[in-house]
Regions:
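Transmembrane beta-barrel wall of Gram-negative outer-membrane proteins
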Residues: 24-55, 60-99, 104-108, 157-166
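Short, functional N-terminal and low-complexity linear motifs
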Residues: 1-4, 34-42, 52, 123-128, ...
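Flexible, solvent-exposed coil segments and beta strand-coil junctions
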Residues: 9-17, 46-55, 132-142
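Acidic/polar loop-and-plug regions of large Gram-negative outer-membrane beta-barrel proteins
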Residues: 73-75, 82-158, 172
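N-terminal periplasmic accessory domains that precede
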Residues: 1-21, 30-38
């Protein structure tokens, strides 16, 4: 199965512009973004760029995120024809928070408890671990692997060509 969606996210800016934004929230959640556009150059060309960073310590123990993304495009516009070279992508580092938590685990270990990356050791800290044989909680020493993360890097490059023949027909 496959498909395509023809979508315009922003109209062509005729004037130079830029924007910067900063935000901050709970659990050290933060976002920084900067965008710049050349405006129309020589009646035909536009260059746009954007950089974004999002980070958070996360609500769940060891649930931090570190996300970076970029977008760069240059486009040629000539009446009914558009040719754009576009590159976008990002890098993501997310700590593992996939495991669910039972009511008893929350009762003994708190709402933010995360068993991801946990292993038993003699030198670790105490957490309630459930014995699979009898179902009763028992205290055991555990520790957590450092950098138990998912790491992604994605780079996308596209050439987009569009020509409008008339008000009813266009080719992309």
């Amino acid at each position: 199965f496959g498909g395509a969606v023809n979508m315009t996210t922003a109209s062509i800016g005729t004037d130079f512009s830029g924007e910067a934004s900063l935000s901050y929230g709970s659990y050290n959640t933060n976002k920084q973004a900067v965008r710049i556009s050349s405006g129309l150059l020589g009646d035909h060309w536009v260059v746009d760029a954007r950089l974004t960073h999002i980070g958070s310590d996360g609500y769940i123990d060891r649930g931090a995120t570190d996300l970076k993304s970029y977008m760069f495009q240059t486009g040629y516009y000539n009446g009914r024809t558009i040719v754009k070279l576009l590159s976008f992508g990002g890098k993501a580092k997310t700590y593992l928070t996939y495991n669910g938590v039972t009511k008893d685990e929350m009762k003994y270990n708190g709402r933010r408890y995360n068993s991801g990356g946990m292993y038993r050791t003699e030198d670790g800290r105490y957490h309630t671990i459930y014995n699979s044989n009898d179902g009763y909680p028992e205290w055991q020493k555990v520790d957590y692997y450092d950098d138990e993360t998912d790491n992604y890097l994605q780079i996308n490059n596209q050439i987009v060509v569009s020509h409008r023949f008339n008000d009813r027909w266009a080719l992309n």
